Regions:
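Short, low-complexity, intrinsically disordered N-terminal peptides in bacterial proteins
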Residues: 1-13, 299-303
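Short amphipathic alpha-helical segments, especially helix-boundary/capping motifs
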Residues: 6-12, 48-53, 76-82, 113-118, ...
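Local sequence-structure signature of Cys/Sec-based thiol-disulfide redox active-site neighborhoods
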Residues: 7-35, 49-51
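A generic structural signal for alpha->beta connector loops
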Residues: 12, 43-45, 276
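C-terminal cap of thioredoxin/glutaredoxin-like
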Residues: 17, 30-36, 124-303
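Charge-dense, low-complexity intrinsically disordered segments
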Residues: 23, 61, 65, 94, ...
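A generic structural signal for short coil/turn motifs at secondary-structure boundaries
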Residues: 24, 56-59, 222-224
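Structural alpha/beta surface segment adjacent to cysteine/selenocysteine redox centers
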Residues: 28-141
């Protein structure tokens, strides 16, 4: 799926990730996307686009409990494919993706490590605890103890009542619009399951399936939608940027991975967790926390 897009400024390769904090396929893809970022290293510019899976203008469900049960079953089916943890019970469906997306976008101003941890905590609120952080109060609780996070600055930037015209909201609004202008290659795309990634039909047209990655480089653009392997992502990156450096051989050290990310799932640890990891058990498999993360994680606090 090669286009004629101009090569980006800066690094020769740009990777654009369309995602949402509460998308189960995006949650399950995190191990592969982390591996992709490690493989590309500093040779790529990464940009995350928040697609707003649950929009704020949607009508509330007439039976919230039934909706939560139905969506929980969907999460269970996705988890069976991805190997990602899932909650024993989804207590509610997120009322909107906007508050969490605003928080995740605002966190980017505090650096990539903080931004990654914020998005991870938001995902864990839904896919481990079963209580999606979809309000400012729930977001604040989910982010308690994130190392390096200036929670007050995040609240001012993303969660204030008067944020409708703030730069962060304008950015996420652009993200939403970009997600709803998919490239023609994915409109009408059909393929083998479980998630081939064809653009989703919506009332206003189409939006990208989540996750979808765009790779832009000197040789054009490729779009890689849906549930994909690291090899497929790397092949697309090399197709548009043939001079990418070789990917280092060997698996990353599990202890170093846990130290860096503080939270890992079973697909990232094929040989098991390193010593000292703290397991949070779920019906979809364990989430492994570093001792430092376990000491502050809301997942281990009393309900």
């Amino acid at each position: 799926m090669t286009g004629r897009d101009a090569a980006p400024a800066g690094p020769a390769l740009e990777v654009v990730e369309f995602t949402d904090p509460f998308c189960p396929w995006a949650w399950g893809s995190e191990p592969v996307l982390r591996a992709l970022r490690r493989a590309l290293g500093g040779g790529a510019a990464h940009r995350r686009v928040f697609g707003i899976l649950f929009d704020e203008d949607e009508e509330p469900a007439p039976d919230p409990a039934a909706e939560a049960a139905w969506y929980g079953e969907f999460v269970t089916r996705v988890s069976a494919h991805t190997g990602a943890p899932r909650p024993a019970r989804l207590h509610w469906v997120a009322a909107s993706s906007w508050p969490a997306s605003l928080a995740a976008a605002a966190a980017e101003a505090q650096g990539p490590r903080v931004a990654e941890r914020v998005l991870r905590r938001l995902r864990e609120s839904m896919f481990v605890r079963g209580e999606p952080a979809d309000t400012p109060e729930r977001i604040a609780a989910a982010l308690r103890g994130v190392p390096g996070l200036d929670a007050a600055a995040l609240a001012v930037a993303a969660l204030a009542v008067a944020a409708a015209s703030a730069p962060v909201r304008e950015r996420v609004a652009r993200d939403r619009a970009e997600t709803r202008a998919p490239r023609p290659e994915v409109v009408g795309l059909r393929g083998a399951g479980p998630h081939p990634g064809g653009a989703k039909e919506i009332a206003a047209g189409h939006r990208y399936a989540l996750p979808t990655l765009l790779f832009r480089g000197p040789a054009g653009c490729r779009v890689v939608p849906g549930w994909r392997s690291a090899a497929e992502y790397l092949a697309a990156a090399r197709a548009v940027c043939p001079r990418l450096p070789a990917v280092p051989d060997g698996r990353p050290d599990p202890a170093e991975l846990l130290r860096r990310h503080r939270s890992l799932t079973a697909p990232e640890l094929p040989d098991g967790p390193p010593p000292g990891a703290v397991a949070v058990d779920t019906p979809g498999g364990p989430l492994h926390l570093s001792p430092e993360e376990a000491a502050v994680s809301p997942l281990l606090s009393a309900s």
